[in-house]
């Protein structure tokens, strides 16, 4: 390979999602056919943010045919990921630019959610357009990015499928050793994953933030809905069941409710400023309150979280194909002079969409795709719940 070959740098940011390796493989194999050199930055922006070129080189791998040829079957990511955020300061952004220049990266592919894409674009804005092009492939099991034609984000189908299996087992367990399971499902702002798993498994109740019309909800609002379902089933002689709760309910709670969940302290946040919803222990707090209310009826309640075990599952066929197409689409976009764009799939075609076109003017962040509670799909899911 020529020393003058264009260099493609790839990194993953944010939480894992099934299919990350598929994007890496799809992009790498196509780039190698073009005669490019491909490198992977370990743990996202973590080492790039240091500005230490030697450190970055020590945490960079050459992506070759032998390394990536069969990884699209595998969950996780061979180049690891992190939530390091160069947008925290101009110094961090300049550190990233320094390292990209030192490694002669001409094409920069990031795989992640809106935070990762925003970070990549902010870095590129300080560089000449002929110096580097930036493309992002959107991923999240939350399925909350505003992709065209209601296209799902990659990893969602796999996460929903595995989540369904787990909840289906809990359904059998709840009946065999009578109890209620309160299942807290990942989903920072939207209820797509929780609703998808609940509907597919036939869970008795699912609560998502979108169905609450008020701007803020109280802890008691959620408690009372779950309590009503438990009592309704009890009236039919059924002292067991499964309720799925989107963790995004926490994001919509009032300050009073948040203080209750987080032990009378300010909610902790991640490097991007998002509340650490997992620390709220929503299902556990609800279980404790419901036992106070219903314990005298002999009701048993067990809290359960589903989330981390979904993120690195081997992708189902849909996601394996989808991610390979996204990887191809990223390289095709580079070849056609695109930058500051996301690769999306619409009507069977992969294409670039300018990142700025997906931003919410009010927040400057990528718009969140919420569950449409007026849709037939939501009505179908709801009609089979015990409400």
Swiss-Prot record:
- Record bears the keyword Plastid: no
Binding positions (Mg(2+)): 114
* Top-rank lineage group of the source organism: Eukaryota
* Pathway named in the protein's UniProt entry: Carbohydrate degradation; glycolysis; D-glyceraldehyde 3-phosphate and glycerone phosphate from D-glucose: step 3/4
- Positions of the site: Important for catalytic activity? 139
Task: Report residues binding substrate.
Answer: 140-142, 186-188, 247, 308-311
Q: Please summarize the record's notes on activators and inhibitors of this protein.
A: Non-allosteric.
Q: Name the InterPro entries on file.
A: ATP_PFK, Phosphofructokinase_dom, PKF_sf, PPi-PFK_TM0289
So which cofactors does this thing need?
A: Mg(2+)
GO molecular function annotation: 6-phosphofructokinase activity; diphosphate-fructose-6-phosphate 1-phosphotransferase activity; metal ion binding; phosphofructokinase activity
> Which keywords appear in this protein's UniProt record, sorted alphabetically?
Cytoplasm, Glycolysis, Kinase, Magnesium, Metal-binding, Transferase
- List the catalytic activities from the record: beta-D-fructose 6-phosphate + diphosphate = beta-D-fructose 1,6-bisphosphate + phosphate + H(+)
Q: What is its EC number?
A: 2.7.1.90
In chain numbering, the residues marked as site (Important for catalytic activity and substrate specificity) are 115
The entry's family comment says: Belongs to the phosphofructokinase type A (PFKA) family. PPi-dependent PFK group II subfamily. Clade 'Short' sub-subfamily.
Describe the task this protein carries out. Catalyzes the phosphorylation of D-fructose 6-phosphate, the first committing step of glycolysis. Uses inorganic phosphate (PPi) as phosphoryl donor instead of ATP like common ATP-dependent phosphofructokinases (ATP-PFKs), which renders the reaction reversible, and can thus function both in glycolysis and gluconeogenesis. Consistently, PPi-PFK can replace the enzymes of both the forward (ATP-PFK) and reverse (fructose-bisphosphatase (FBPase)) reactions.
What is the designated name of this protein?
Answer: Pyrophosphate--fructose 6-phosphate 1-phosphotransferase 3
Query: Could you tell me which species this protein originates from?
Result: Trichomonas vaginalis (strain ATCC PRA-98 / G3)
Gene symbol?
Answer: pfk3
């Amino acid at each position: 390979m020529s020393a003058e070959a264009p260099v493609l740098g790839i990194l993953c940011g944010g939480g894992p999602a099934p299919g990350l390796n598929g994007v890496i493989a799809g992009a790498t194999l196509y780039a190698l056919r073009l005669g490019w050199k491909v490198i992977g930055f370990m743990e996202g922006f973590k080492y790039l943010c240091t500005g230490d070129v030697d450190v970055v080189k020590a945490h960079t791998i050459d992506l070759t045919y032998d390394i990536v040829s069969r990884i699209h079957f595998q969950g996780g990511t061979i180049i690891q990921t992190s939530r390091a955020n160069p947008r925290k300061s101009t110094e961090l952004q300049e550190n990233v630019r320094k390292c990209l220049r030192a490694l002669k990266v001409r094409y920069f592919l990031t795989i992640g959610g809106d935070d990762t894409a925003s970070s990549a674009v902010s870095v590129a804005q300080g560089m000449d357009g002929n110096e580097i092009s930036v493309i992002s492939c959107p991923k999240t099991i939350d399925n909350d990015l505003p992709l065209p034609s209601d296209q799902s984000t990659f990893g969602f189908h796999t996460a929903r499928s595995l989540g369904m299996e787990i909840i289906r087992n809990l359904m059998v367990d709840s009946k065999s050793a009578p109890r209620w399971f309160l299942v807290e499902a990942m989903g920072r702002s939207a209820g797509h994953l929780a609703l998808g798993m609940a509907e597919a498994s036939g869970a008795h109740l699912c609560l998502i933030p979108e169905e609450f019309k008020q701007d803020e909800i109280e802890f008691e609002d959620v408690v009372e809905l779950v309590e009503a379902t438990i009592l309704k089933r009890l009236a039919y002689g059924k002292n067991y069941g499964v309720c799925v709760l989107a963790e995004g309910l926490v994001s919509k709670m009032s300050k009073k409710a948040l203080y209750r969940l987080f032990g009378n302290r300010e909610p902790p946040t991640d490097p991007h400023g998002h509340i650490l919803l997992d620390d709220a222990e929503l299902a556990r707090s609800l279980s404790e309150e419901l036992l106070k209310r219903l314990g005298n009826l002999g009701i048993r309640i067990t809290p359960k979280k589903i989330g981390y075990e979904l993120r690195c599952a081997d992708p189902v066929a849909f996601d394996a194909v989808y991610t390979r197409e996204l990887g191809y689409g990223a390289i095709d976009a580079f070849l056609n002079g695109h930058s500051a764009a996301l690769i999306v799939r619409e009507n069977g075609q992969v294409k670039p969409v300018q990142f700025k076109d997906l931003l919410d003017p009010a927040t400057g962040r990528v718009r969140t795709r919420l569950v449409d509670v007026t849709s037939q799909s939501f009505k179908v899911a709801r009609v089979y719940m015990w409400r």
